[in-house]
Amino acid sequence: IGYRNIKEKHIALDIAKELGSFLKKEMPELNIIYTREDDIFLGLKNRTNLANKNKGHIFLSIHANASTAKTARGFEIFLLQPNSVDNAIDVAVRENASIIFEDNPEQYEQNQMFASISEKAYSQESEKLAVSINTAVKTELPRTRMRGVKQAGFYVLVGAAMPKVLIEAGFITNKSEAQLLNKSSYRTQMAYGIFKGVQSYIESHNSQNINR
C-alpha cells in the first residue's frame, strides 16, 4: 500500500491488462496468458508453473515498487540472479515476502539452489528482453526516471523455462509517482511502452532465427 492507500495489486493488474490489449491488437498471433485477471492471490511458484504449462515464450512479472525512502522513484527492470548482493536485494526481499501466505514456503529455498544453473539457458535472452523494454519505456515516457536493468533473486522468476523479467513500473510510496500511477492514462502509456519493448524484442528474435 502506497501514498494515500494506493494498492500495488490494482496498479499492476491494470498495466498487465492494458499490455495484453496492445499485444492482442498489434500481434494477434500471440497467445496471452494472465496469471490473474481479478483480485486473487496466486502463489509465486504457481505463476511460473502456469507459464511453463502453457509453453510460454516470454514471462513478464509486473509490479509497482515501494520504499521507506519517500524520494525513491523511477522505472526499473530486474533479471534473475540468485547471488545478487547489490541494493536490488531490498526489492527482491519485498517481492519474495508473499511466500508467507503459501503452504510450503521452504520450496523456494530449494528451488533457488538450482536457479543459477537453469537460468544460464535463458539469461542472454532475458537481458535482451529487459534492455528492449527499458529502451522503449524511456522513449514513450521521456519524463520518467529510468533506474536501469538490475539483478536479484526473485522467487517469482525461478523455474520459468523461458526469457523472463520482473518490471517495477514506479514507486507507489513516492507522492508524485503514485499520483501518476493512479491515473489510467499514465498506466496506459506505461503499458504501451512495455508493449513496444516486447514487440521489438520478438521481432528482433524472430529475425535472428530466420537468418540462421
Which residues fall in each region the model found?
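Catalytic-core regions of hydrolytic enzymes
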Residues: I1-Q110, E119-V131, N211-R212
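Active-site-adjacent mobile loop/cap segments within catalytic or ligand-binding domains
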Residues: I6, T68, A115-R212
